[in-house]
């Protein structure tokens, strides 16, 4: 049995928006899962465990990027960039959710081809995780000709996500709604493009389209990159219970509006964070951290709640056993602190001030995969593996 203990933690941010902060300073990990959370008494049974001294800094769940356009491996054809997933890991991202693979060279746009591509990419990312990141690839793009039997086959082969509705030849609610119903019947999670056209061949999607189609996730409610109006945002927020995704590669003004209005309505649990990259905007390795900083510093949202938007809110939508610090959850964790030179005293203070926190350690399934981030500024107090 492998065992890791993180001790001397200054603050634990749980990722659970109902209880964002845990009163504890020690986390025990066994065989890749969180086994216990408590105080120094947990060190009594340390045995030959690997000990990580957090040096008084903050531990959060590993971050989720709920909007990634992966195309196979750790390569982004749209921007001709290698190792973007590895770079995101150094920004604290331990799980990625595909929103479809529209940049795949020669992407097939028929039913057989889109199904085959989804199955291939899903299996490939589960077979080989780039840099250890948990990539849920192979989100199927809806194309004309798909049948209910296709969804049954895809689910059997491991595909469980429908990429942004509107990226393929299925564009209007009349065509999309029956496929979404099949997808839900067979256990898929469904995303839907929202806002202006993003790539040639995609479509503009309104609040009315979203309401009629009934996805699980309103993809980039703040635009990808062109946003719907605040009136359309209000309709989605008031007339549905769908998850609302704020992305880094979108409209910051609408992101602020969504966060503030969700807070007013007591609906911050519906807000999740993605990057919407690779895209024409580019690649932003620290995009999820930037979302957290933006929403906390500019929209008056508590930084601990902003962390939940990047972690537990997302895993609740997608049904994943990570993103929350609790016994039995996968031990995907970040140790972070205020960066050198910040006005803040700790990581949450830095996020509230708009400063990117410094990451000193990232763990996936309890194994340290980053021991000093190459992309964040240096942490004032760096964790050490003893």
UniProtKB/Swiss-Prot annotation:
It comes from the Bacteria. It is an enzyme of class 3 (hydrolase). Its EC number is 3.5.2.18. One of its GO terms (cellular component) is cytosol. GO terms for biological process: nicotinate catabolic process. Fe cation binds at residues 164, 193, 220. Zn(2+) binds at residues 67, 69, 164, 276. InterPro entries: Amidohydro-rel, Metal-dep_hydrolase_composite, Metal_Hydrolase, Metallo-dep_Hydrolases_sf. It catalyses: 1,4,5,6-tetrahydro-6-oxonicotinate + 2 H2O = 2-formylglutarate + NH4(+). Binds 1 Fe cation per subunit. Belongs to the metallo-dependent hydrolases superfamily. Adenine deaminase family. This is Enamidase. It comes from Eubacterium barkeri (Clostridium barkeri). The lineage of its organism: Bacteria, Bacillati, Bacillota, Clostridia, Eubacteriales.
